[in-house]
UniProtKB/Swiss-Prot annotation:
Primary subcellular site in the record, as a coarse category: membrane
Source organism, top-level taxon: Eukaryota
SUPFAM superfamilies reported in the protein's UniProt record: Growth factor receptor domain, Kazal-type serine protease inhibitors, PDZ domain-like, Trypsin-like serine proteases
Pfam family of the protein (one): IGFBP
GO BP, one annotated term: negative regulation of transforming growth factor beta receptor signaling pathway
Entries under CDD domains matching the protein: cpPDZ_HtrA-like, KAZAL_FS
Subunit-structure text: Forms homotrimers. In the presence of substrate, may form higher-order multimers in a PDZ-independent manner. Interacts with TGF-beta family members, including BMP4, TGFB1, TGFB2, activin A and GDF5.
Organism: Rattus norvegicus
Domain IGFBP N-terminal: 33-113
Family, similarity comment: Belongs to the peptidase S1C family.
Protein name: Serine protease HTRA1
Locations listed in the record: Cell membrane; Secreted; Cytoplasm, Cytosol
Length: 480
């Protein structure tokens, strides 16, 4: 824009100058000679344009023959040739010359139609696109590589245009930028048998809820692991201690010792969540720090009894945001950056669930009370699976998505088998359907949970594809 003002001012001074500063020979200030265009354009009768066209080749005033265009800043609009590629003839006063306007026409200047700077492949910043194109033509004349446009704006790190669409409407990116520093990657280690060597066995995500290092995650992420390591967004790693676990609700609290204050995430009110709201799931799947998925809330009250997730008194948040093993334990947030749930499991494509933030608040309050009073808790039996109750409608939906899904309409559908657990050792696999244990029929996932509490050995019959397989699993006792 500054260049345009300068160019127009130069033209004005040129037109108001003394007679000694006349226009080029043969060009009058007004009443230019009429350009006579042929009735029909015959390109074969056009003179070949010069090979050296610094302003680029353009069509003549009749739109027929190729000619060399005038350079930026050249006089135009009278008897001169047309402006070069990307340039337009700007007349500060009066009207430009045209096929119908000649006598009252005024001279103008060739000005670039694009006024913003651009960065070229030669790492130079050009005032506008036209100057870059001129530089590219000069480079090609010298048999050098052409200069191409790398980006709008100056080379190097520029400032984002506040009026751009991506600045106005990228609200998801704003949320991620706000919450990412408080999201952590969790790595789990276990010692090899008959060896002191430790190996990573699983990973997950979590989020910081206190400035002194308290972190919330899923219970299944940290349960039954010898050592827990936490990595912050800046790459710093810390050993973590497990402070409290509610294996039934699948919530855990761990703690790292960190000097200074840590960024934290605040809990929102999941009771105020509405179906259709945008949500963002963030975590570290496959050990990739802060991978983001987005979606909407499908329903806010998917009952625990319906899902069979071992907590019949809790309603889960269902979302189509992608949740997997890696971002399990990470936060599900609203557009205000408030945590409204913990990413907990994916059933199939487009169907994932999160533990509501109101349940997290209850867990944190009860955990505080337990630690303040020094209460002890009894051990719980654990086999290491995540499951849901299978209904006829859910079975039909899964069969539509997976052709090899077992031909059953009830039972406990295994969503995940956690590595290095009794379930894995016994031979259970994802997508198995438990149909009986110790001779008792299994209709829901709650049936499995009840038997685990009572029995020391589980003789299971599972439907895998079209086969019934007998599997023995021995639960182990763990700290809750």
């Amino acid at each position: 824009m500054q260049f345009l003002r300068t160019a127009l001012l130069s033209l004005l001074l040129l037109l108001l100058a003394a007679p000694s500063l006349a226009l080029p020979s043969g060009i009058s200030r007004s009443a230019p000679a009429a350009t006579v265009c042929p009735e029909h354009c015959d390109p074969t009768r056009c003179a070949p344009p010069p090979t050296d066209c610094e302003g680029g080749r353009v069509r003549d005033a009749c739109g027929c023959c190729e000619v060399c265009g005038a350079l930026e800043g050249a006089v135009c609009g009278l008897q001169e040739g047309p402006c070069g590629e990307g340039l337009q003839c700007v007349v500060p006063f009066g009207v430009p010359a045209s096929a119908t306007v000649r006598r009252r026409a005024q001279a103008g200047l060739c000005v670039c139609a694009s006024s913003e700077p651009v960065c070229g492949s030669d790492a130079k910043t050009y005032t506008n696109l036209c100057q870059l194109r001129a530089a590219s033509r000069r480079s090609e004349k010298l048999r050098q590589p052409p200069v191409i446009v790398l980006q709008r704006g100056a080379c190097g790190q520029g400032q984002e245009d506040p009026n751009s669409l991506r600045h106005k409407y990228n609200f998801i990116a704003d949320v991620v930028e706000k919450i990412a520093p408080a999201v952590v990657h969790i790595e789990l280690y276990r010692k090899l048998p008959f060896s002191k060597r430790e190996v990573p066995v699983a990973s997950g995500s979590g989020f910081i809820v206190s400035e002194d290092g308290l972190i919330v995650t899923n219970a299944h992420v940290v349960t039954n692991k010898n050592r827990v390591k936490v990595e912050l967004k800046n790459g710093a790693t810390y050993e973590a201690k497990i402070k409290d676990v509610d294996e039934k609700a699948d919530i855990a609290l761990i703690k790292i010792d960190h000097q200074g204050k840590l960024p934290v995430l605040l809990l929102g009110r999941s009771s105020e969540l509405r179906p259709g709201e945008f949500v963002v799931a963030i975590g570290s799947p496959f050990s990739l720090q802060n991978t983001v998925t987005t979606g909407i809330v499908s329903t806010t009250q998917r009952g625990g009894k319906e899902l069979g997730l071992r907590n019949s008194d809790m309603d889960y948040i269902q979302t189509d945001a992608i949740i997997n093993y890696g971002n399990s334990g990470g936060p599900l947030v609203n557009l205000d950056g408030e945590v409204i749930g913990i990413n907990t499991l994916k059933v199939t494509a487009g169907i994932s669930f999160a533990i509501p933030s109101d349940k997290i608040k209850k867990f944190l309050t009860e955990s505080h009370d337990r630690q303040a009073k020094g209460k002890t808790v009894t051990k719980k039996k654990y086999i290491g699976i995540r499951m849901m109750s299978l209904t006829s409608s859910k079975a039909k939906e899964l069969k539509d998505r997976h052709r090899d899904f077992p031909d059953v309409i009830s039972g406990a559908y295994i969503i995940e088998v956690i590595p290095d657990t009794p379930a894995e050792a016994g031979g259970l696999k994802e997508n198995d359907v438990i149909i009986s244990i110790n001779g008792q029929s299994v209709v829901t996932a709650n049936d499995v949970s009840d038997v685990i509490k009572k029995e020391n050995t589980l003789n299971m019959v599972v439907r895998r594809g079209n086969e019934d397989i007998v599997i023995t699993v021995v639960p182990e006792e763990i700290d809750p």
